[in-house]
Amino acid sequence: MCHAILGIKWEPGDVVVTTNHEHGGGLTPLNIAVDRYGIEVSMIQVPTGNRQSASTYVQLFDERIRALKGQGKRVRAMMWSSPTYKTGTMLPIADLMEVVKAHGLISIVDGAHLPGMMAYDYGALGMDFMSGAGHKWQCGPGSTGILVIRNKMRASNPLPLPDWFTIHTSSYARQQPRGAYDIAATVTSCGSLHVPMFRALARACEMWDSIGRKKIETYDLTLSAYLKEKIVERWGIDSLYSPKDDPKLVSALTCFNPFRNRDDVMNQQKATTFVNRMLSDFSPGFVIRSVNFEVIGAPAQHYGIRISTHLWHDANDIDRLVESMWNLSGAMA
């Protein structure tokens, strides 16, 4: 995200429209751009739970952009996470790209969880920039990542390419020929490359390819759907922060409120204790995490419990997890 955001040729007063559920990986370079270039950030309050649809996000972004333009603001870009690391909501890239194209904007997607989880064709989606982690669902080494940069005008995005300059490279020639410029070669040229680390990432990618990325996506999402239904059976539909019924919004991340006293989800210490006890009180224990985020209309942040369903899990793992979480939530009531 630093490469994408800080390489753009910003002007003072440029506005980036984003959400209030972004990761620090995107917010940090965005805040640097605010102080360094004088850009402005407009944050949309996003919904949580099952009562939302892909059209919700199209409307939220489009209305905000139109309102800003009506105020005389110069909106330059949209930045969003697909999925959000907080609730696992898959903001619909293809749908939001229609908003991008309608308003002639730069598109920046924090897709940290996409590689290894979803079998997306990034060229067909058409975003200008998409950053993905190499060490999450792709299961490569830590400190590796994937950056997708749109390098041509095509049907998926006929907008002119944004002016962008690499911020970390050991090879740069001035006045590059735009038609033949190998932007990937410049971005990946970094002097003393950590060869074993990146070869390990490439090997992990090859393994995923050999299994079949669409097969992995289907398996992960099927397990996630099973988990969500099991949560609804015990805690009710309102316990979910993740949507489950709109296929455009689902991911293999699930976030919910496990507490019998619903307000306990605003207690950070209780959420931390729940995560710690899920690891310590059961054999084998469970590795889950707590994430904090704003909920529209809530008096304080919620500390939801987030669960990942990977290709090495199965339905029996989900059953044992749900039963254990139910028992622990009862013990903590």
Sequence positions of predicted segments:
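Structural motif of enzymes handling amino- and sulfur-group chemistry
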Residues: 172-229, 252
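PLP-dependent enzyme catalytic core of the Aspartate aminotransferase-like
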Residues: 268, 277-281, 290-333
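Active-site phosphate-binding strand-loop segment of PLP-dependent enzymes
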Residues: 51-112, 116, 137
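Conserved beta-loop-alpha segment that forms the PLP phosphate-binding cup at the N-terminus of a helix
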Residues: 1-15, 23-27
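Active-site PLP attachment segment
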Residues: 125-177
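Conserved PLP-binding catalytic core of the aspartate aminotransferase-like
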Residues: 221-225, 232-282
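PLP-dependent aminotransferase-class I/II
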Residues: 18-78
